[in-house]
Structures are given as structure tokens and as C-alpha cells.
């Protein structure tokens, strides 16, 4: 059977072709638009204006584009080497362009300023959230220690305050009379006592007894 006799509606299922555009890089890029991708204008324009899209077909047969009707037809045996070389050249060119487009798309995704800014903001927000949650967890784990420390600090403060109050409310020393050494708790009582005590004339009981004895002896 000749290649030209095989109908085009049945793709070759024995040995399916492996083309460069079935690489993983194209699976990660969903139909990139040429206007949004940073690439050289010459490659984009030449690739976009190419009329030979036979290499994008799923058939194993080498085909050529029928420009009159826009439908692919099988190549004749005489034109088969020329079509194969053209398809091979188109495949190479397509793989290079698609690789360039994919790399450009990836580079743009990584170097897009708004995305970088949002990524940094998200990282900063996540860091703040994690730090707050970590502090909250530490506070919950060590809440008893914190309460004990606060209570001890308050107790020390109350002791210092009580000491100052006790010093301020310390009672006055006892007041002592300079003549008879009598103690008093108030200065007014001491003054009244000294007014009478200092004006008294000193006397001895022996004087009274001696006078009585002399009077009795004389009479």
C-alpha cells in the first residue's frame, strides 16, 4: 500500500509522533498571547505569519498545505522528500520559537513587579501572623509563670509602700521631765507638769521629824 492510498481521516496509531510542542513547558503555559510575551519582534512576526502549519497536524503522514481550499492533502511520491525536509525545518523552527516563548513567559512571571510586590506583601503578612501566633502560644504556655511574676512584683511594691507608711506613722518618743524624770506621751502634759514641778521648793521629810523630836524634848 502506498502512502497516498491511506485515508487522511485515520491517524497513525502504531507509532505516534513525538513533537517538541508536546513538552512539559507547553503544558504549563496555557495558550500564551503573543502581545503579552516579551520576545523578539522578528521571531514572533515570522512565526505568526507562517503559512505552513502542517507540523501542528496529528497525522504521521508528511502533508503539504493546499492554499486554495485550506485543507491538508497527502504529498505525492515525487514531492515527499521536499515535504519531509520542509516539515523537519518547520518542526525545528517551531520548537525553537515555542521554547523561546515559554522561557519568556516564565521569565515574565518571575520578574513581573506587581506579582513580586504582592508576593513580598503576602510573605510579610504571613510572617506577622506566624509571629503573633507564636507569641500567643508562648503566652498561653507560660501564663502561670507570668501571673506569678506579676504577683511577686506587686507584693514587693506593697512591702515598700507599707515600709514608707510605717516610717511616716511612727509614734513620737516618750517625753521625760528634766527634774523628776517622769515620762509623758504628749508635749502638753509635759509642759503642764514642768510648770508645777520646777516651781516647787525642795524639802526633806527628816526635817519634819527632827523638829518634832526637838519640840518634844524641850517641852
Swiss-Prot record:
Q: Which domain of life is it from?
A: Eukaryota
Q: For this UniProt record, give its keywords in alphabetical order, as a comma-separated list.
A: Activator, Cell cycle, Cell division, Metal-binding, Mitosis, Phosphoprotein, Transcription, Transcription regulation, Zinc, Zinc-finger
Query: Which chain segments does UniProt annotate as zinc-finger regions (unnamed)?
Result: 177-197
Question: One cellular component GO annotation, for this chain's record?
Answer: nucleus
Q: Name one GO molecular function term.
A: SAGA complex binding
* Presence of the UniProt keyword Zinc in the record: yes
| Protein name, per record | Transcriptional activator protein rep2
- What organism does the UniProt record list as the source? Schizosaccharomyces pombe (strain 972 / ATCC 24843) (Fission yeast)
